[in-house]
């Protein structure tokens, strides 16, 4: 499981208000620009916990820890109703991490292709800069991997123009 902070899990409400359970005004602003999900008028993310799950999901993915990445996206996904852009994004990224896991850890490219096809369906219509993640690159790489799985070797997710990698201190956000 992945947590957004050292105290509460992603599914826990903030201040006991279920309607505000994805809001966290303490989450840092974007690394660059004003991506979809950032509200410049309030100076906060629309869903702070989604931003944190995305940051940690990207870091673990880029460290080659696809199962941990999957868990970060999946745990946050449960916070959103089906039919929302947030749900589609998170479900798609769960599939991306699972597909990379199939390819890298199991050399199962048929499984990877199946998961990436599903990921592309979920990510269709999600803005290219959703919560700072470069989804145009994600979609392009998933399509290319269908014919040439080796494009995944060394590929890293980019958020705010950077490709951050999990450090030892990031492990505090993973719980059993």
Regions found by a protein language model. Give the residues of each.
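Acidic, polar-rich N-terminal leader regions of halophilic archaeal proteins
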Residues: 1-176
């Amino acid at each position: 499981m992945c947590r957004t902070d050292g105290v509460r899990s992603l599914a826990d409400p903030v201040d006991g208000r279920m309607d505000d359970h994805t809001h966290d005004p303490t989450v840092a602003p974007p690394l660059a620009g004003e991506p979809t999900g950032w509200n410049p008028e309030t100076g906060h993310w629309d869903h702070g916990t989604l931003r944190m799950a995305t940051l940690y999901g990207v870091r673990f993915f880029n460290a080659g820890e696809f199962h941990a990445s999957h868990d970060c996206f999946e745990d946050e996904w449960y916070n959103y109703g089906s039919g929302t852009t947030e749900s589609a994004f998170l479900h798609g990224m769960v599939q991306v991490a699972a597909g990379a896991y199939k390819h890298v850890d199991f050399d199962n490219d048929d499984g990877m292709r199946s998961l990436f096809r599903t990921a592309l369906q979920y990510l269709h219509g999600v803005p290219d800069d959703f919560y700072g993640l470069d989804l145009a690159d994600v979609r392009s790489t998933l399509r290319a991997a269908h014919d040439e799985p080796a494009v995944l070797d060394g590929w890293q997710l980019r958020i705010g123009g950077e490709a951050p990698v999990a450090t030892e201190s990031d492990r505090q956000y993973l719980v059993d």
